[in-house]
């Protein structure tokens, strides 16, 4: 696996974020750069092998931790104010500015997991994104959880998680083995009772106004990227309703959906998180690679437009104007 370089960069409000970059030694103006937006309370290092895979395919890649998570966690998480709004409008915005500065003029692409798809819609500079791939990206409401698991998930994520957060001032996910620790604001966003984010989103301790909500909706409609939303049939978090609820916000994008069943690739389960495990490098990762580099899916997977026309069949010839891969410096 290629060795990334550790880096730090400012979010839009100056908060220092930490991450890694996979860069090629020789610059090339047409080489795409991929920003990887993590899921809620998932460390950026979870995506390292996926990032190395995209790097080997000819991309520059940036991974990073949102504020309050992993390398971007403050010394004291109790009382630290951060939520999905900050992760999108400030942190992802900072990542876009960083790749624009570091790889000036190169095409910017996004690979987003779960809540990372919502972050795509909230950054003021999201119009810079030329193409996006999302995995299990949704604005989930508890009623959207898988029917057979809904009650257990409701107790876990909507009763126990907010109760522990209220007691401690943050969610101790790592201690429980559920996920990483998370700021209280993220828990508030996750456990909100309404199915639309603008109705329940919070911005730190600031009062959310109708003007802010209108601005968020405008920013979600701003990107003109080609967007592929991948869903997995055994994903208990991201059912069809949740996936399509988020997809509906991106009215300026050309949108496609791809739904995959584990049996299609000969495995018993995939779920919400396993896509980024390297055991799927030969079966699932080509979906992301081919979409980001070619704007189409491998022939064994059929995406459908949402709504509209079917995307073109993938040409197996190299993407036009792609640069030769090279080792990272150092």
What are these regions (language model features)?
Residues 223, 229-231:
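Short beta-strand/loop motif that positions the catalytic acidic residue
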Residues 39-42:
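Active-site glycine-rich loops that stabilize anionic/oxyanionic intermediates
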Residues 81-102:
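Alpha/beta-hydrolase active-site loop
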Residues 44-76:
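Conserved alpha/beta-hydrolase
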Residues 238-249:
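Short alpha-helix in the alpha/beta-hydrolase fold that links the catalytic acid
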Residues 1-24:
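N-terminal cap/lid segment of alpha/beta-hydrolase-fold proteins
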């Amino acid at each position: 696996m290629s060795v990334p370089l550790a880096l730090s960069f400012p979010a839009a409000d100056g908060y220092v974020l930490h991450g890694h970059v996979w860069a090629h030694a020789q610059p090339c103006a047409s080489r795409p750069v991929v920003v990887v937006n993590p899921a809620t309370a998932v460390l950026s290092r979870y995506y390292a092998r996926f990032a190395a895979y995209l790097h080997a395919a000819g991309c520059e890649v940036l991974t990073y931790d949102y504020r309050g998570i992993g390398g971007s966690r403050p010394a004291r998480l109790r009382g630290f104010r951060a939520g999905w709004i900050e992760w999108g409008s400030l942190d992802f915005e900072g990542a876009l500015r960083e790749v624009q500065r570091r790889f000036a003029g190169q095409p910017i692409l996004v690979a987003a997991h779960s809540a990372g798809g919502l972050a795509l819609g909230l950054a003021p500079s999201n119009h810079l994104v030329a193409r996006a791939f999302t995995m299990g990206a949704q604005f989930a409401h508890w009623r959207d959880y898988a029917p057979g698991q809904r009650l257990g998930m409701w107790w876990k994520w909507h009763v126990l998680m907010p109760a522990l957060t209220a007691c401690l001032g943050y969610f101790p996910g790592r201690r429980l083995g559920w996920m990483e620790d998370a700021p209280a604001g993220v828990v508030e966003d996750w456990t909100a009772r309404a199915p639309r984010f603008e109705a329940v989103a919070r911005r730190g301790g600031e009062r959310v106004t109708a003007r802010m909500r209108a601005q968020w909706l405008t920013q979600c409609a701003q990107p003109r990227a080609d967007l592929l939303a991948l869903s997995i049939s055994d994903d208990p978090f991201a059912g069809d309703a949740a996936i399509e609820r988020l997809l509906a916000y991106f009215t300026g994008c050309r949108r496609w959906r791809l739904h995959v069943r584990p049996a299609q690739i000969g495995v018993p389960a995939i779920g919400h998180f396993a896509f980024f495990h390297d055991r799927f490098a030969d079966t699932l990762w080509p979906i992301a690679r081919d979409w980001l580099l070619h704007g189409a899916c491998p022939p064994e997977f059929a995406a459908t437009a949402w709504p509209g026309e079917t995307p073109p069949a993938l040409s197996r010839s190299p993407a036009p104007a792609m640069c030769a891969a090279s080792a990272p410096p150092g």
